[in-house]
Amino acid sequence: MKNKPENVIMTEGDPKKIIFRFAQPLIFANLFQQLYNTMDTIIVGKINGDEALAAVGVSFAVTMVMIAVATGTGIGTSVLIAKYCGAGNKSKIKTGISTVLIFSLMVAALIAVLGVVFSMPLLRLLKTPQNIINDAADYLRIYSLGMPFMFLYNVQASVFSALGNSKTPFHLLVMSSLLNIGFDLLFVGGFSMGVSGAAWATFIAQGVSAVISFLLLTDKVYRKDHERAEFSFFSGAVLKEMSSYAAVSVIQQSVVSVGMLIVQSAVNPFGSDVLAGYTAASKIDSFAIMPFIACGNAVSTYTAQNLGAGKKERIREGYKASVLLCAGIAVIEFAVIMLLRRRFLGFFMDLSSSSASAIETGMGYMTDLAFCYIIMGINSSFNGMLRGLGCLKLFLSGSIINLTFRIIFTYALVSVIGVSAVWLSMPAGWVLSFIYGRVGYRIMCKKKDSAGISDI
């Protein structure tokens, strides 16, 4: 029996089957990515209590900005490499990969230095409670040191996906997640290193996955290329072209994360009890939205490859397939969360000793958002199509509108309805972003039929 090829050919065949097949490893990879980020919270919270849980939660709001830059660089890289792949341009694929790896490591080194130096001032700016600020700063400094590993892995995973291979990143994430869990248990539980131990566990797991993914990618793209296509190790022209994609994605991801920081500062004054419940529920929410983000990334790669191959008529069907998949996932998530939300909360908190306000906050967060994930799925699929088409300014402006509205909504209502204003602002922002994107896209298509799919 022949093994299925690792790379999914997206320019031929049934779009629904292609999207479903390609999205599945991406969904599981994203879930493991979230597990990777979440095990610190679970193990620290269960072993060291609510204050340690809150410290990791506050730190995570800051690390999301760092993750955003790495993710944005990966997204921008993925779109361009997918276009090169669709056009069959191996020389540009190789040049693009080596160029972005060099550039991303330089950016990562800068972010690492800034993270180590400015951890404490930033946490003070966010009004972090004094009883957790030292632990949060320790976690943040150690996490910052791992930026080169994070960038290296994110860019390489995006390249694999752009080439139609979503399985390799998934396998690497499974390995990395298991390593992270093992070192978390060893450092936090065995050596009693607390919050710092969780940060070191993440550092080591990221390093291993980054090195292995580098070896696999260079072996696949460079050593096993029998055609020996000529390429430049570093190209200013390719970097400029890639930057036009990556810069918008980095800005968009950073805007989202900075917005989360601002929103986080609305939660912090409620105290460590509410913050612990919010942190636990936000981790569960992060798992819930991962499949929709994966579907958006699948649509982005699918769209870019078909655009590069000149098969614009296939793009509409890919978008519709992603929306259908997201709808099914949203229904399942609603049922699971409503049935098991208290048990999920128990993964992060000791419900027998946690305060009533912490539990009430977490339960309220999960219950309210369970009704709204279908909106997230539709919006993510549409944004993925926009990225694949190269409509990056429209995508960016929609994200800015989303976050701006979320911030206004939160601060306008937090004194009226309490901390629930923070999470209720999310679906409101998704709706506004989708409406803006649809209207903007139709206007753009009337001016210039850039993709031939205006009637979506």
Label each region the model flagged.
Residues I27, L31, L35, M39, ...:
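Generic alpha-helical transmembrane segments of integral inner-membrane proteins
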Residues G74, Y143-S161, P169-S177, A198-S213, ...:
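Short runs within selected transmembrane alpha-helices of multi-pass transporters and secretion channels
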Residues L31, L35-L53, L123-Q130, L186-M193, ...:
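Helix-terminus/linker motif at the lipid-water interface of multi-pass membrane proteins
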Residues N48-A61, A136, L140, A199, ...:
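Small-residue hotspots at the loop-to-helix junctions and early N-terminal turns
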Residues R21-D40, I142, Y153, S176, ...:
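Transmembrane helical elements of multi-pass membrane transporters/channels
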Residues L53-V113, M150-P169, G277-R341, M376-G390, ...:
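Small-residue-rich hydrophobic transmembrane alpha-helices
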Residues M1-A23, I81-G146, G190-A247, T303-F371, ...:
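Short alpha-helical transmembrane segments in multi-pass integral membrane proteins
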Residues M10-I47, A61-G76, L80, L105-A112, ...:
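N-terminal transmembrane alpha-helices
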